[in-house]
A protein has these predicted regions:
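Oxidoreductase cofactor-interface core, primarily capturing Rossmann-like NAD(P)-dependent enzymes
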Residues: 1-18, 32-44, 53-63, 67-76, ...
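A hydrophobic C-terminal alpha-helical subdomain
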Residues: 203-259
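Residues lining the SAM
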Residues: 50, 80, 246
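Conserved SAM-binding strand-loop segment of SAM-dependent methyltransferases
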Residues: 25-28
C-alpha cells in the first residue's frame, strides 16, 4: 500500500510530521469533536481505531470515533483491545469491553485485535534493575505473553490489507508466556549480571511508587495491573499473530537489547 493511500487522524499535526514526510495525508481531529471526526473520515474506507491513552475517558472517545465512522460511511473498522477483554480483572479491561460491545452493536463490519502486553513496557526498568539486580512486582506466579510493538503493528497491517478478518476477535499474543522469573532472567541476559525476581504485595508496590513521587491513585492502578497478572489475565498464548506476520514473535531479550 502506498503512503498516499493512508490517512492519519491525529490531535496534534506536529507529532505526525514524520508520517507527512513519507506522503501520508494527516488530518486533525479531537476525540471530543464529533464534527471534526466526521469530516476527517470522509472518503475513508477502513479505520484502525487505536485505543486511546486517557483511562476513564477511553470508552467515550472510542464511541465518538465509531459513531463518526458510521455516519461517514466507513466500511470497516479494526479496534485494538486487550487480552481476554470480556473476562479480565485487569483495570484496563472494562473500557475495552465496553468498546467491543458498542462496536458489535454499531453494525460496522469490524475486527477486534486483543493485544497482549508490549515488551517495550519493561524497557524503562532496565537502568534500575541493572543497578539493583532485582525485579520486584506483585505479579505472583502470573505469566505474560507479550510481543513487540512491531509484531503487533505488522499483524494489524496484515489484517487491514488482506481479506477474511471481518467479525473475528483475534487474541494477539507472543509465542511464549513468560513468568516474572523468566522476565528477570531476560534482564540478566541483557545486563550481564544475575537478576532475581522478588515477589511483593500490592501494598508494597504502592508504597514504593509513592515514595518515588507517584500519586497514590496512579500507584494503586499500577499495582492492580500487577495483581491482575497474578490472576492470569495476560497468560493466554495464541498462534494467530505469528501466523499473520509469518515469523516468530520478537523475544523480550531482543527488545531490551534495543532499548
Amino acid at each position: 500500500m502506498a503512503p498516499s493511500d493512508v490517512v492519519a487522524i491525529v490531535r496534534d499535526a506536529d507529532k505526525a510530521a514524520d508520517l507527512a514526510a513519507k506522503g501520508v495525508e494527516v488530518r486533525v481531529a479531537d476525540y471530543a469533536d464529533t464534527d471534526a471526526l466526521g469530516k476527517a473520515l470522509v472518503g475513508v474506507d477502513k479505520v484502525l481505531l487505536i485505543s486511546s491513552n486517557e483511562v476513564g475517558q477511553r470508552f467515550a472517545q472510542h464511541r465518538n470515533v465509531i459513531d463518526a465512522a458510521t455516519s461517514a460511511g466507513v466500511l470497516y473498522l479494526a479496534y485494538t483491545s486487550i487480552t481476554k477483554a470480556t473476562e479480565s480483572s485487569n483495570p484496563l479491561a472494562p473500557e475495552h469491553q465496553q468498546t467491543e460491545e458498542y462496536l458489535a452493536a454499531s453494525g460496522l463490519a469490524h475486527t477486534v485485535l486483543r493485544n497482549n502486553w508490549y515488551h517495550e513496557n519493561y524497557q524503562a526498568q532496565l537502568p534500575a534493575i541493572a543497578e539493583s539486580g532485582v525485579l520486584a512486582a506483585a505479579a505472583g506466579d502470573g505469566k505474560v505473553a507479550a510481543a513487540s510493538r512491531k509484531d503487533f503493528a505488522d499483524g494489524t497491517a496484515k489484517v487491514l490489507t488482506t481479506d477474511g478478518h471481518e467479525g473475528k476477535v483475534y487474541e494477539f499474543t507472543g509465542d511464549t508466556a513468560l513468568s516474572y522469573a523468566d522476565i528477570a532472567d531476560a534482564f540478566g541476559q541483557v545486563t550481564g549480571s544475575e537478576v532475581v525476581y522478588q515477589p511483593v504485595t500490592a501494598a508494597d508496590v504502592v508504597a514504593a511508587m509513592v515514595q518515588a513521587g507517584l500519586d497514590e491513585e496512579t500507584a494503586g492502578f499500577v499495582a492492580a495491573i500487577d495483581t491482575s497478572i497474578a490472576e492470569g489475565t495476560l497468560d493466554l498464548v495464541d498462534s494467530i499473530l505469528g501466523q499473520l506476520i509469518g515469523r516468530p514473535t520478537t523475544t523480550l531479550v531482543d527488545v531490551l537489547r534495543a532499548a
